[in-house]
């Protein structure tokens, strides 16, 4: 939808979280390796909130504890240690992680801290075994340049990544500690972003700077974007976990739609003098004979059915606030997160789900529900139902006040769902187990003297030096394989850089689309491919099949792959002999069409010779031999 974002007073700020490709984790010597094989063991923990020195309990932490969840942590004996399990003090900070943080800070024109103090930031969702995340403030007050103008960068922090979530059950969450402790940069911008397109461009530019260092991890889950969004007469909403750059624009658009819609609902509710009745009524007996599968299942498991009355809410609960999501979805999210229930029913959508019109009539009569009123009902265990309906009552009251400040989860369709309230501001405490780090002028000077080439500079050089067209050069500059491309192009000057770039960018993607696991392919494999090509062991047409061969047989050498694929390179004499045979086999066509038979013959030659001889040599030889026959 097209909005006048300036008129709406849209303000957006980004938090970019980028994993670093360091030799070890931030506070221990374990490798930064993510695994998917069976873990060697598990531990269980329950985290409880405690008062701060000021006597306060963080509201987000308190809310999390009310879910009564236990946390299960998977570990590996050979790639994780007691530091991740919070049974051993942290080691000194990984020095290469600090250097990368300073390098990125310099590229974003930031002011460095003289001394870096490690801090503890409260974490309330169980994603850190200790209940806090270690983080350190490195720099502040910088900016990035974009086509929309400069965007301020508030701060850059170096911190440890959280555990990897494995499973989320009703009364537990399972994590793996293999990701915990991987060095992570947190880059926070000022709320200078004033349109969805500008938000996407800002995130793209920060990502470009990060990749330019060559010291960050690549792939799904290695970079995550949180987006803070607000409009005039709205509220600040923090959207967590946007992994796809292309989704940022849609997330912002849909959140603006949501806030506008919620404001419209508020105005309508106020006109109606709407009221939320606090009383929760037991309607188990009323619906004990229902044929609704959901309600019957709850009753069978010794659950209850309870309901609340929302006066003046008729038609409002079913009102859309985001594409495919309604005010009722907002209520349901609260009930699911805070009560642990599967969902709720409301009279705006009934009769439905096996609940009959007769049952709806009885329900409305029992609840004293008027024409403009609505009823919400929930079925589950008694304690869950109570928690869920109390959460819905609170959210319904908020809908008459305005838009609540929340942390919300990014969904794949560009919408968001409730996660938790915005956390309190005072969640940082000094880390007592790790000494501070002094940032010297000598260190900063060394960083400034070794800054990487920026992508826009590299693009110009690739077009000029390697004669790539601009589109391919752009792909290569942003590619994970950019360093390998340069290395191979310089090492094997006999091969055109365009072929190397196309192989790394296009051929590998095509092979992946065919269902082969290109992650099994190492740089050593690719080195062998181009080395063999430069030594005339194979033709360029053989490259895709040889790469597939390495994926299928990762331990084999090039000569073995060529043998398996039947692509050992032929001599010129062998090629000439095969082409002569093909011409003789099709002599009737040659006599009839002369040089017009070239297309047919070329197809038949390639069928026999593809991968065994260069296509140009085949073409040239065929033309020569065909001319001799025609003459």
From Swiss-Prot:
Its signal peptide is: none
Tell me which Gene3D superfamilies the record gives: 1.10.10.410, GAD-like domain (3.30.1360.30), GatB domain, N-terminal subdomain (1.10.150.380)
- EC assignment: the record states 6.3.5.-
Q: Name one GO cellular component term.
A: cytoplasm
Q: Name one GO biological process term.
A: translation
What sort of enzyme, by top EC class, is this?
Answer: ligase
Q: Which InterPro entries match?
A: Asn/Gln-tRNA_amidoTrfase_suB/E (IPR017959), Asn/Gln-tRNA_Trfase_suB/E_cat (IPR006075), Asn/Gln_amidotransferase (IPR018027), Asn/Gln_tRNA_amidoTrase-B-like (IPR003789), GAD-like_sf (IPR004115), GAD_dom (IPR029351), GatB_C_1 (IPR042114), GatB_Yqey_C_2 (IPR023168)
Please write the reaction equations for the catalytic activity of this protein.
Answer: L-glutamyl-tRNA(Gln) + L-glutamine + ATP + H2O = L-glutaminyl-tRNA(Gln) + L-glutamate + ADP + phosphate + H(+)
- Record SUPFAM superfamilies: GAD domain-like (SSF55261), GatB/YqeY motif (SSF89095), Glutamine synthetase/guanido kinase (SSF55931)
Q: How does it assemble?
A: Heterodimer of GatD and GatE.
What protein is this chain from? Glutamyl-tRNA(Gln) amidotransferase subunit E
Annotated source species: Methanococcus maripaludis (strain C6 / ATCC BAA-1332)
């Amino acid at each position: 939808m097209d909005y006048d974002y300036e008129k709406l007073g849209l303000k957006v700020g980004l938090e970019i979280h980028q994993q670093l490709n360091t030799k070890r984790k931030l506070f221990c010597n374990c490798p930064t390796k993510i695994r998917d094989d069976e873990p060697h063991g598990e531990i269980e923990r329950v985290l409880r909130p405690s008062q701060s020195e000021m006597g306060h309990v963080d509201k987000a932490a308190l809310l999390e504890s009310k879910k009564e969840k236990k946390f299960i942590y998977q570990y590996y004996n050979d790639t994780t240690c007691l530091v991740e399990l919070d049974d051993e003090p942290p080691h000194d900070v990984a020095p290469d992680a600090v250097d990368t943080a300073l390098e990125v800070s310099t590229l974003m024109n930031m002011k460095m801290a003289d001394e870096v103090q490690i801090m503890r930031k409260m974490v309330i969702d169980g994603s850190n075994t200790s209940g806090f995340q270690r983080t350190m403030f490195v720099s502040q007050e910088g900016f990035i340049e974009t086509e929309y103008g400069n965007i301020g960068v508030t701060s850059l922090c170096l911190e440890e990544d959280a555990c990897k979530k494995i499973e989320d059950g009703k009364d537990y969450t399972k994590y793996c500690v293999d990701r915990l402790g991987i060095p992570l940069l947190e880059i926070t911008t000022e709320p200078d972003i004033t349109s969805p397109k500008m938000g996407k461009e800002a995130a793209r530019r920060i990502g470009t700077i990060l990749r330019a260092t060559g010291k960050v991890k690549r792939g799904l889950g290695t970079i995550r974007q949180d987006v803070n969004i607000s409009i005039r007469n709205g509220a600040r909403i923090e959207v967590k976990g946007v992994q796809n750059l292309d989704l940022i624009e849609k997330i912002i658009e849909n959140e603006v739609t949501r806030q506008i819609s919620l404001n419209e609902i508020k105005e309508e509710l106020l006109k109606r003098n709407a009221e939320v009745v606090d009383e929760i009524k037991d309607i188990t007996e009323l619906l004990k004979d229902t044929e609704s599968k959901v309600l019957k299942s709850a009753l069978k498991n010794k659950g209850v059915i309870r309901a609340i009355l929302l006066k003046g809410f008729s038609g409002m609960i079913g009102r859309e606030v985001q594409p495919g999501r309604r005010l009722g979805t907002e209520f349901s999210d609260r009930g699911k997160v805070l009560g642990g229930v599967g969902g709720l029913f409301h009279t705006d959508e009934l009769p439905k789900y096996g609940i009959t019109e007769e049952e709806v009539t009885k329900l409305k009569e029992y609840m004293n529900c008027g024409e403009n009123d609505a009823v919400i009902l929930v079925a589950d265990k008694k304690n869950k139902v109570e928690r869920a309906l109390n959460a819905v009552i609170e959210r319904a009251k908020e809908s008459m006040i305005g838009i609540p400040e929340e942390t919300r989860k990014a969904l794949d369709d560009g919408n968001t769902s409730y996660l938790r309230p915005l956390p309190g501001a005072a969640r940082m405490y000094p880390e007592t187990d790790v000494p501070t780090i002094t940032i010297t002028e000598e260190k900063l000077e060394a960083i400034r003297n070794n800054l990487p080439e920026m992508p826009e500079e590299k693009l110009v050089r690739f077009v000029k030096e390697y004669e790539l067209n601009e589109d391919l050069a752009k792909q290569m500059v942003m590619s994970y394989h950019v360093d390998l491309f340069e290395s191979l192009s310089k090492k094997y000057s006999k091969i055109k850089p365009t072929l190397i770039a196309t192989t790394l960018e296009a051929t590998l993607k095509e092979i992946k689309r065919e269902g082969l696991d290109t992650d099994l392919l190492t740089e050593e494999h690719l080195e062998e491919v181009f080395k063999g090509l430069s030594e005339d062991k194979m033709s360029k047409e053989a490259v895709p099949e040889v790469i597939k061969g390495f994926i299928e047989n990762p331990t084999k050498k090039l000569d073995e792959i060529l043998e398996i694929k039947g692509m050992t390179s032929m001599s010129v004499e062998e090629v000439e002999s095969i082409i002569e045979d093909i011409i003789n086999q099709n002599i009737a066509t040659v006599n009839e069409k002369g040089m017009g038979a070239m297309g047919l013959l070329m197809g038949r030659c390639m069928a026999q010779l593809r991968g065994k001889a260069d296509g140009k040599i085949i073409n040239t030889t065929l033309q020569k031999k065909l001319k001799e026959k025609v003459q």
